[in-house]
Amino acid sequence: MTRPIVADISAAALRHNVAVVREHAPRARIMAAVKANAYGHGVTLCAPVLAEAGVDAFAVASLEEAEALHALGLERPICLLGGPFDADEVSVAAERAYLLVIHEQRQLQWLETRAADAALRLFIKVDTGMHRLGFAPERLPALFAALQRHPRWEVLGLMSHLARSDTPDDPFNRQQAGVFADAIAHVGHVTAGQHSLANSGGVLALPFTHQYWVRPGLMLYGLSPFAGRRGSEIGLQPVLSWRSAVVAIRELGPGDWLGYGAAWQAPARCRVGVVAAGYGDGYPRHLGCGAPVTVAGQTTRTLARVSMDMLFVDLTAVEADIGAPVVLMGAGGPPLESLAAELGTISYEMSCRMQMRVPRRLVS
């Protein structure tokens, strides 16, 4: 018998969320972020659905991710958001016609060494205030003068990243957009005009950041980029439903101890279900003892400590037997955003926690 844990990935929800992007940014092209295995959801399942839904390009974090995506044969441009990490990657990227985001001088030296006469399509990353990656705006004129020595290198546009789009009212968003606009004014005329600034928060709440490309990530998977708000509250549909089942039931008497460390003691007679899911699957260990979980369509809570492969749920008030369905998080269960808040983290991290040993299954 197969271990019952599975991550159901909703094709309908993916299509719906792409439509939400179109609604908010109708004139922009969509570069769908599918890095980190589509934020944990499974790139081999999600990317074909996103392509069918009409996204115009994909964005990944590494050459390895680009190669895995390329193997799917989706005929969409693939953008390496971090550009090449060494000179050897330049040759592969040039052969595959990947879009490269260039953010520092060393990468330009690699291009000169390995692809001086190759046809390349580039974005230039501008540091608009986040101070993570990108060229300072004052360096752009000299940079573009050097780029123009290579007529087969096409600079598609400028790219930058919003640091506080999760708080749309923060004035830093307009400050960054202003720096970006100034950079476009100075060097945009020597690009193809395909600039990009907006991430999910920008798409949903900051229309002044919409350029030729928008780069939604988290929202495609139905998750909210805004603290204190769920995706369902802003018109999105959760793509993930992380499911398992009850594999054993224990009847505890008053004073009986449960789990590792005997960390939980039954205050009265109770019924406990053992679920096939644990921190080895990516379910957070710190969600033991009190986190919401759905069993047989009813909300209950976890008990005691989460083990590597199993966790406990309270079935005292739940009509459920061995084999009863369990939704750990996502559609049909606790919202992932709520569990992330309970842990003091963000939904990005929560969605990326799920391990590869959890099978992903596309459902329509």
Swiss-Prot record:
Documented EC number(s): 5.1.1.1
Chain positions recorded as substrate binding sites: 132, 308
Residues bearing the modification N6-(pyridoxal phosphate)lysine: 35
Cofactor(s), names only, from the UniProt record: pyridoxal 5'-phosphate
Gene Ontology biological-process entries: D-alanine biosynthetic process
Role this protein plays: Catalyzes the interconversion of L-alanine and D-alanine. May also act on other amino acids.
Protein name (Swiss-Prot/TrEMBL): Alanine racemase
Organism: Acidithiobacillus ferrooxidans (strain ATCC 23270 / DSM 14882 / CIP 104768 / NCIMB 8455) (Ferrobacillus ferrooxidans (strain ATCC 23270))
Lineage of producing organism: Bacteria, Pseudomonadati, Pseudomonadota, Acidithiobacillia, Acidithiobacillales
